[in-house]
Structures are given as structure tokens and as C-alpha cells.
Design a protein with these regions (language model features):
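Generic structural signal for well-ordered, non-membrane alpha-helical segments
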Residues: 9, 13, 33, 84, ...
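Internal alpha-helical scaffold of NAD(P)-dependent oxidoreductase catalytic cores
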Residues: 83, 94, 119-127, 146-232
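Alpha-helix C-terminal capping/helix-to-coil transition sites in glycosyltransferase folds
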Residues: 70-71, 188, 240
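NAD(P)+-binding Rossmann beta1-loop-alpha1 motif at the extreme N-terminus of oxidoreductases
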Residues: 1-53, 60-63
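NAD(P)-dependent Rossmann-like dehydrogenase/reductase catalytic/cofactor-binding core
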Residues: 196-197, 225-235, 243-334
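Rossmann-like NAD(P)(H) cofactor-binding subdomain of soluble oxidoreductases
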Residues: 55, 61-70, 74-144, 162
């Protein structure tokens, strides 16, 4: 049995706390807002984020970070990527040397172009930062539906240790050395999912969605390869796996936000309607900047940025994608 603190009471942090508790671990769930911790302690449910899911009494819920970071074996960072630097800075003085931190947030910081793990490493240099990612909606994990993810760490032994902690009969975990590829897949797929949702909102069909998914993963892999990630990572759980579920699922807030924009909502109206953090909106500008920095052609990413930040009509964005110059899918040159 391990002592595990999950930092963040959003849907994903709560779902992972329940999973780890059911695996027999001693779990503490921390909220950055003491009033929310008090409310969850009283009701044991978050009807807004995970309706109908009861947090087991064995999970200790606290709003005190000193208590949460009192010698845990591992710490899970589950705050949204947009808040990760502030949270990391706040918690850094309490994190011991060599502490294993598992990041489960997905995103790239706009002003630094850093993936989330790099943000945590910069603010908490004494920690051993790892990442868990893959096609894993909290709504399904919290209900015990079969799910598969991937974990990456600096050392193989650490990845295998985390694999053993998270693995269960309904939650299968693979390991990989490619932390950068795992993080890029998790961040970029949210932007592509906005495009897929927009196509749904416009009333387009499965052909359109299949095109966005396959051409989207091509964009993600091109950028990843230029940045030093492994191409095969994008054919795995944190790449195409996460992209498929985020583009297709009714649980996907990125897909839903895109759907609403396809229906005529503005970006802000769509975010207000979703009522939860839409990570793709925060990662879109960073994805565009990375494409420009590494000179990688990413037309879907570019059109999503125009849709979000230049008020380009969704139908015009799709038309411009369809009317691009003729291309090879695979090079004819050996």
C-alpha cells in the first residue's frame, strides 16, 4: 500500500483518487480552495463535475497543502494546465527532495511553449516529475469502465513502480521512455478536438471527422518528430488513442466547445456553456507558435486559431482546409 496525495479536486483528480483508493492505497485529495474541500467532505460528491459519483469515506479530503504533502510516496498533480505554474510555485516549498510527482494535466504554456511537466520541473526542481496520459475520460474511470493509459518517467524503474500503483483489473497502464511525445500528444489532441467538434456543429458527417483525426495525428506527429519525440508514440495511447476519444466522446469538453462554435457560439460563449476548463483553447496559441518555431506545416491547428481568436466563420475554416493545394499523403521518394 502506498501513501498518495492527489492535488486537485476536478473530475480527473477525483476519478484518479477513487481508482487509487480502490487499488488499496492510502489516498488524500487536496483542493486549492478550502471551502470546496469542506463541501466535498460533507457531501462526498461533486454534482457539477462528476454527478452521481460518491467519493469513498476512506479518501481524506483536505484544503491544507501541508497536510497533503506530509511525506507521501507519490503526489499526483491534477490541476488544469493553465493553473499549473501557479499551483507548482505555491506547493514547491513543501515538496521534499526526490519526491515523485505524476502530472496528469495536458497542455502547453503559451508564453514559454513548455509542456506541463517542464513547468513543474522549473518550479519544483527537487522533484522527480513523471506523466500519466491516454484516452481516459474521468466520467468513465470513476465508474470503473475499462481504460488504458501510458506512464512515462526519467527512469524505467520509476515508470514501472507507477505502473504497479495505478494498474487494476479495469485500468491498464503501459510504460514508455518518451515523455515529450506523451505530453505533446495530450496537449495537441485537444486543439484538434475543437476542430472535430466544430465539424459536428456544422452538421458534417463521419467522413469529415475521420479526415480531421487522421490529418490531425499527422500534424501532431510531424511537430513531435521535429521536437525530438518518437514517431511511434503518436500511434499509441497518448497519441491517436487520446485523439480518437477526445474527438468522438460525449464526455469531451473540447469537442463540445467546438460543437457549440460550429453552431454559431463565440469562443467565450462556448466556454461559458461548457462550464469546465477547455484545455484546447489554452493550448491553441502555443501549438501555433510551436508550428512556426519548428517550421512545421499544421493547417488544422492554424485554422482553429483563426476560429478562436480571429472570429473566422467555422464554415470558412473548413472550406479553406478543403481547398488547400494538392498534397502527397506519403512521399513518392524512397
Amino acid at each position: 500500500m502506498a501513501k498518495i496525495s492527489v492535488m486537485g479536486t476536478g473530475s480527473w483528480g477525483t476519478a484518479l483518487a477513487i481508482l487509487l483508493h480502490n487499488n488499496g492505497h492510502q489516498v488524500m485529495l487536496w483542493s486549492a480552495h478550502p471551502e470546496k474541500a469542506a463541501s466535498l467532505n460533507q457531501t462526498r460528491e461533486d454534482p457539477k463535475k462528476l454527478p452521481g459519483i460518491i467519493i469513498p469515506d476512506g479518501i481524506v479530503i483536505t484544503g491544507d497543502e501541508k497536510t497533503a504533502l506530509d511525506s507521501p510516496d507519490i503526489v499526483v498533480f491534477a490541476s488544469p494546465s493553465a493553473y499549473m505554474r501557479a499551483i507548482s510555485k505555491r506547493l514547491s516549498p513543501l515538496v521534499r527532495q526526490g519526491q515523485i510527482i505524476v502530472n496528469v494535466a495536458k497542455g502547453v504554456e503559451e508564453n514559454t511553449l513548455m509542456p506541463v511537466c517542464d513547468i513543474i520541473k522549473e518550479e519544483i526542481p527537487q522533484a522527480d516529475v513523471c506523466v500519466l496520459s491516454g484516452p481516459s475520460h474521468a466520467e468513465e474511470v470513476s465508474r470503473g469502465l475499462p481504460t488504458t493509459c501510458v506512464v512515462s518517467a526519467r527512469k524505467k524503474e520509476t515508470a514501472e513502480y507507477l505502473q504497479s500503483l495505478f494498474m487494476s483489473p479495469v485500468f491498464r497502464v503501459y510504460t514508455t521512455p518518451d515523455m515529450l511525445g506523451v505530453e505533446l500528444g495530450g496537449a495537441l489532441k485537444n486543439v484538434i478536438a475543437l476542430a472535430a467538434g466544430t465539424a459536428d456543429g456544422l452538421g458534417y458527417g463521419d467522413n469529415t471527422k475521420a479526415a480531421l483525426i487522421t490529418r490531425g495525428i499527422a500534424e501532431m506527429a510531424r511537430l513531435g518528430a521535429k521536437m525530438g519525440a518518437k514517431l511511434e508514440t503518436f500511434a499509441g495511447l497518448s497519441g491517436i488513442g487520446d485523439l480518437i476519444v477526445t474527438c468522438a466522446s460525449v464526455h469531451s469538453r473540447n469537442r463540445r466547445a467546438g460543437y457549440l462554435m460550429g453552431q454559431g457560439y463565440t469562443m467565450q460563449q462556448a466556454m461559458d456553456e461548457v462550464q469546465m476548463v477547455v484545455e484546447g483553447v489554452y493550448s491553441a496559441k502555443a501549438a501555433k507558435a510551436l508550428a512556426e518555431k519548428y517550421d512545421v506545416e499544421m493547417p488544422i491547428i492554424m485554422e482553429v486559431n483563426k476560429l478562436l481568436f480571429e472570429n473566422k466563420p467555422a464554415s470558412e475554416a473548413v472550406k479553406d482546409l478543403m481547398q488547400r493545394e494538392k498534397q502527397e499523403e506519403i512521399s513518392w521518394e524512397l
